[in-house]
């Protein structure tokens, strides 16, 4: 269980009926290590038990929403005994976030990449500033998306376009992501002002009815998302053993283009 896990890498602020969870690793562009994953689950479960909170905002401190999984954690978890607990933690985070009995908003500034993008897709609404860059870029290091990305992308795009986004691994501008239907809103001016406008609009609505609709859809989709998370976990294990993945990691560290061979 991750309840009562304490870390300075995740901040929680509550203002009336709105809670804001902030990833606090600006020096790594809010990369997601095990402490952050556990901290996010802890804060979300704490919020889920509050009858006073209706809206949860997920954001990152500094210049990025989240650059994705921490590459140092990835390199240190070559052993499956370390890998599977991390993947289970990711699954717990995504299931908790997706089924949270609150209205959830991702406020994206800067990069939302890899697992960071998957996490944003698990929320009900994504608002991004015009300078944001969003990427499902696992393929660049010979991996598959995780964090339920196969589920969320197919829901938003359909199977054909979801596969294309995954296979391309392209960095998308906010405009491109909006055109595809991956995000719901681009802040025309200040992100915080646009976020507050969205929050105030929702607070003026019957939020309990909105949350009930969310609960029904989340419960209906729960078995499918759980299955996707399981398939991603074991699929990722296989990809970690490939020559292409090891080449992708080396190329990333050496800041060069990878030479993939399909093995």
Where are these regions (language model features)?
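Conserved CoA-thioester-binding segment of acyl-CoA-metabolizing enzymes
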Residues: 1-61, 95
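C-terminal long alpha-helix characteristic of the crotonase
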Residues: 127-132, 183-230, 237-243, 259-263
